[in-house]
Each structure stands twice: as structure tokens, then as C-alpha cells.
Amino acid sequence: MRRLTRRLVLPVFGVLWITVLLFFWVTKRKLEVPTGPEVQTPKPSDADWDDLWDQFDERRYLNAKKWRVGDDPYKLYAFNQRESERISSNRAIPDTRHLRCTLLVYCTDLPPTSIIITFHNEARSTLLRTIRSVLNRTPTHLIREIILVDDFSNDPDDCKQLIKLPKVKCLRNNERQGLVRSRIRGADIAQGTTLTFLDSHCEVNRDWLQPLLHRVKEDYTRVVCPVIDIINLDTFTYIESASELRGGFDWSLHFQWEQLSPEQKARRLDPTEPIRTPIIAGGLFVIDKAWFDYLGKYDMDMDIWGGENFEISFRVWMCGGSLEIVPCSRVGHVFRKKHPYVFPDGNANTYIKNTKRTAEVWMDEYKQYYYAARPFALERPFGNVESRLDLRKNLRCQSFKWYLENIYPELSIPKESSIQKGNIRQRQKCLESQRQNNQETPNLKLSPCAKVKGEDAKSQVWAFTYTQQILQEELCLSVITLFPGAPVVLVLCKNGDDRQQWTKTGSHIEHIASHLCLDTDMFGDGTENGKEIVVNPCESSLMSQHWDMVSS
């Protein structure tokens, strides 16, 4: 009997041990994001990829639009085309994730996604590198399709030739539609249960998609974004971005990245935890397709580009969803300093129209602060927003007051929203902006005060805002240096920039940071036409420093 017992002990113990191991293994597989070794996802064999790429003549595709020696490499795309073409479409980039991200395991039944990339006259080298990075660094079974939407580029072959690549489809607009309507067109034909929007000058990093799809699979109302790394526009060096950033904005609806507060950082016990963000940059995100449709897609009446990220961000938060940045997902992006393409109504006018539509539909009584920051938006047409107001009502969305209190309490409400608008006069002359020879920003000068059809000439109308800026459209009075005699120039407005802040003291307009006063200096031939706008030490006796703000 003892011998029989001894014989049974080892087999029984072995079975129990195997059972325990199986129990822990199954439990581990059921956990959504436990720590452990990285899951190996199925990938096509090298031979399969080689066969697919053999059907595409990459050299011929790139050479057809190649930069030519002697041409300005920045002219067409506002980044260094020569350097982009020098770099392989298949280049390696550094893995910029936190080390703990590499230990996360994701479930194997993530939903495949439709990747939508819209573009207009994109450089072929960056477009191809975007697609190739997706194909190289994404598990094949997670890509339902890659939908390219060509927004009426000059050359249809920019898109058409790319359908030879695996998973790629091409749609071409018959006329320029802009980002919003192009994205909607791509989303309408998408067959995936989730939509992944990317810009056309990106490079996705290792295991970028799984963390995003995982968050949406857990909760379909989440809209999730990667951390956006920087691809240098001059050298195309891939640069790691800080992970503890979120999207923010000011009352002019100008997007800006902001650091998490010390309190928010202290609450983050794990660097892989998603970060709630009041607003997304808008270029790169994943959203459940049914949720996208239910929320009303995009505002179809927004033009070209700009402001759509505010509209969708307010709508998601106020109508029952949430926005997140997922630190374990990284995507590089070329950030340009200016747009390389033409806006039919001008960049500033288009942005004002789009943001004004957002303010009128979503910001309730707080839109007064938008108009105080952008006074020239008051008179701009913005189309009919009744359908978007009806959408908000039908979705039973929260108020903008709720959004400020619960999502973005850090946005301080101005104590006042008054605006003074009109001429800045010196006797019979008015401060005027004059644009010459297609220069990017106009010059300042004194000119005879003028009227057009009974109204003050637009080039002579200025607004003095509660932010202590003197502006015209998107441009603010600023100084190059803080020294006497420094020229006063027009630059893009930026809230909080002390070089752009002024105060009216009696007949003086004083620059706050330098304590110098707005003045005119003679130059050139010494005539009235040769007066330069500068700042100088304030002197009450100088008539050249006496200014009147005359309301329109």
C-alpha cells in the first residue's frame, strides 16, 4: 500500500503543478494589460512582403517628382525635400517609448482598423514613408485597409500608383474639398470597425497601434491619440517628444501643448497610463466608427484645414465621450512652419470661419471671450450652423460651462471682454499696414486716413483687446528688441508674449515690457512719407508720440 501511495504521489503532484501553471497562464491571457513578455503577433513572411513590393517601382515613383539641383528644396512642401528624398522609405527610427511599454501585453482579438490618410500635393517621399512605416510596424491582421484620399492634387498619380502596395486604396476628389470633407469621404467607405486618422508626413513607431485599439476596445466612447514625436523639417531627424504633455488652448482658439501640472504628475503612478486631454491636435487619432457616425462625424461646412480639432474635441467631451493621449503609442510627425498650399479664401479667413462655427455652436455665452480675442471674427461670414445646433440638442450634450468646470478648469476666464476698435491717429494720419511684393507680413507706416464706401479702410482699422494686444486680423504690433529706436513690426499674435503688450496712457501708447512709447522716426528722404514706426523713451512734449484711438 505504501509503495502504491509513493507511486501515486509524484504523478498527482505533477498534475497539480501543471494545473496551477495552466491556471496562471489562462488568467494572464484574460488580463487586458498585464505585465509580461511582449506578444508576438503574426506577420507576413519576408518572401510575401518582397512579392508585394516587387509590384511597385519605388524608384520610378520617387524620381518622377524628384528635387532638382538649383531649386529651393523648401519651396514646394515647406520642408527639406532634398533631405527627405535622401532618406530611405524603409529607414529605422529609434523606439522612443518608455521601457515599461515594452512589457505590456495586449489581447489578440483587437479590432482591425481602417487607416485614413488625406493629402493635397504631398511630397511623394514623405507620403511613401508614411505608408511604409505603417506596413512595417503594424501587425497585418490589425490593418483592414489603408485609404488614401487625394484632395485634388495636381498629379493624380501621386495616389493612383500607390494602390499596388498592400492594403492601399485610393480615392480622388474631383475638386478641392479640404481635410474635413476628405476625411468624411474616407470614413464613409471604411470597412473597419475603428477609424485611424493619420497625416501624410508621419512615421509610426514600433507597436504604435495596439495601445490605441486596446483603449477603444475597452470603451468605444474614447477617442485616443499617440504621443507625437518630432521629425525635423530640415534634417528629418526623428526626435523624441516629452510624454507628459496634453493639448490646451487660449480664448482665441489657438492650440498649444502644455505640461501636466505638478499635481497631475504626482497622480500618475505609472508612466504608461493614458493622459486625459482637453483637446487633441487633430491630425492623428483613433475612434470607433459607429461612435464617429453617431456623434455627427465632422462639421461638413468647415473649409480646407484648421479649427476642426476644437469642434470634435468639444463635441466628444460634451456629448458623453473622452479624449486621451496614450504614452505607449508613438508617431513621428513633420511640423512645418507654414502651409505649402494655397487657401482659396486665405489662411486667416479660413481659420476664423472654422473656429467661429465652433464658437457659435459649442461655446455658449463664453463665445464672448473668443470674440474679444479675435475681434475681427465678429464681421466674418461663417455659414449656417442650424444643423450642428440641432445635432447638439439631439445628442443632449453638456454646456460649455460644464466643460470648463470638469475638463479644463485651468483655462482662466478673463475679468473683462471689452474691445476698442478703430483708427490709431496722429493728427490727420492713421497707422496703416501695407503689404508689398507678396511679402508674408505687411509693413507699418503713417498714411492719410481713408474711407472705402463710407467705412474706414480695413488696413487702418485696429483692435485693442483685453489681452493688451493691438491687432489687425491675425497680426499684432510687436517690437524686435526692447531698446530705444527699435522698429515696431507686425507678427502673428501670441497670447502671453510681452513683446506684443501695450497700454494707453493719456495720449501715449506705451509698450509694457520696455516702458517705451510708440513713436515715428524720419528716415530716407526725411519727408512725411519716410516715417518709420518705432518705440522711444516717452516724452510728453513730443507730438510724434501723441496718438488718438478713434472708434469705428
UniProtKB/Swiss-Prot annotation:
Pfam families: Glycos_transf_2 (PF00535), Ricin_B_lectin (PF00652). Residues 110-215 are annotated as: Catalytic subdomain A. Its main location: Golgi. Residues 274-336 are annotated as: Catalytic subdomain B. Substrate binds at D151, R176, S200, W305, R336, H339, Y341. GO terms for biological process: O-glycan processing; protein O-linked glycosylation. It is found in: Golgi apparatus membrane. It is a single-pass type II membrane protein. Residues 1-6 are cytoplasmic. Disulfide bonds join C101-C328, C319-C397, C430-C449, C476-C493, C517-C538. Its cofactor is Mn(2+). Detected in renal tubules (at protein level). Highly expressed in fetal and adult kidney. Widely expressed at low level. Weakly expressed in whole brain, cerebellum, thymus, lung, mammary gland, liver, stomach, small intestine, colon, pancreas, spleen, bladder, uterus, placenta, testis, ovary, skeletal muscle, leukocyte, B-cell, bone marrow, fetal brain, fetal thymus, fetal lung, fetal liver, fetal small intestine, fetal spleen, fetal skeletal and fetus. Detected in renal tubules (at protein level). Its EC number is 2.4.1.41. Keywords: Disulfide bond, Glycosyltransferase, Golgi apparatus, Lectin, Manganese, Membrane, Metal-binding, Signal-anchor, Transferase, Transmembrane, Transmembrane helix. Pathway: Protein modification; protein glycosylation. Residues 27-552 are lumenal. GO terms for molecular function: carbohydrate binding; metal ion binding; polypeptide N-acetylgalactosaminyltransferase activity. Residues 415-550 form the Ricin B-type lectin domain. Mn(2+) binds at D199, H201, H333. It catalyses: L-seryl-[protein] + UDP-N-acetyl-alpha-D-galactosamine = a 3-O-[N-acetyl-alpha-D-galactosaminyl]-L-seryl-[protein] + UDP + H(+); L-threonyl-[protein] + UDP-N-acetyl-alpha-D-galactosamine = a 3-O-[N-acetyl-alpha-D-galactosaminyl]-L-threonyl-[protein] + UDP + H(+). There are two conserved domains in the glycosyltransferase region: the N-terminal domain (domain A, also called GT1 motif), which is probably involved in manganese coordination and substrate binding and the C-terminal domain (domain B, also called Gal/GalNAc-T motif), which is probably involved in catalytic reaction and UDP-Gal binding. Belongs to the glycosyltransferase 2 family. GalNAc-T subfamily. Catalyzes the initial reaction in O-linked oligosaccharide biosynthesis, the transfer of an N-acetyl-D-galactosamine residue to a serine or threonine residue on the protein receptor. Displays activity toward mucin-derived peptide substrates such as Muc2, Muc5AC, Muc7, and Muc13 (-58). May be involved in O-glycosylation in kidney. This is Polypeptide N-acetylgalactosaminyltransferase 14. The gene is GALNT14.
